[in-house]
Amino acid sequence: MNKTIQLQDLGHKDYKATWDYQEQLFQNVLDIKIQNRREERQDQTPNYFLFVEHPHVYTLGKSGDLSNLLLSEKQLEAKGATFYKINRGGDITYHGPGQIVGYPILDLENFFTDIHKYLRLLEEAIILTLAEYNITGTRSEGETGVWLGVGTPFARKICALGVRASRWVTMHGFALNANADLGYFDNIIPCGIKGKAVTSLNVELGVEKVNEEEVKEKILKHFTQLFDCTVI
């Protein structure tokens, strides 16, 4: 089993170009697995972790409802945003500047074969990261992602999750609002859940801007501990 993960920080990158790159890495891992089974080989499969920040974009999961996007094509254009229907789970979400997006492309057979556990560990990495800023992140029953103030009238989402998996290989991942412009969430019903607010790290801390590189380091630290892996 290969528990080494190749880290790549893609910086500010177009959503479609990043999606294509994810698909390329995802397919590479799948091809090795298929070839191993076909030829009774035991070649190691690679694992990747991509950090990226996207320009303004809305994405809709495969089971999502398009009516949760509250903008017409012209309005999208006026806001300088794009839209894609994609092959992850979940409904609609927003990505943009000031948001930390992580795409782990893992062969879970290197770790454990349990998608539910995988999602919970992604959430846990974010919850532990928030705790370092004295913010209490929690899960909300029946809803993926990381929330604040669950069980109160002020429940709000700070991190969205949506993944795809095939033959235990994962892609897509999480989006943590660090310094995101929350106004862009007004144009959707986030994750298809009505009446729930969104928030960001800088808003919760009452500061103009948080250090995103520092946040990424903390996420990675907790991710490697939870998955018992090494990042190169």
From Swiss-Prot:
The active site is at 191 (acyl-thioester intermediate). This is Octanoyltransferase. Belongs to the LipB family. Substrate binds at residues 88-95, 160-162, 173-175. GO terms for biological process: protein modification process. It catalyses: octanoyl-[ACP] + L-lysyl-[protein] = N(6)-octanoyl-L-lysyl-[protein] + holo-[ACP] + H(+). In the reaction, the free carboxyl group of octanoic acid is attached via an amide linkage to the epsilon-amino group of a specific lysine residue of lipoyl domains of lipoate-dependent enzymes. The record marks 157 as: Lowers pKa of active site Cys. It is found in: Cytoplasm. Pathway: Protein modification; protein lipoylation via endogenous pathway; protein N(6)-(lipoyl)lysine from octanoyl-[acyl-carrier-protein]: step 1/2. Its EC number is 2.3.1.181. Residues 43-231 form the BPL/LPL catalytic domain. Keywords: Acyltransferase, Cytoplasm, Transferase. Signal peptide: none annotated. Pfam families: LplA-B_cat.
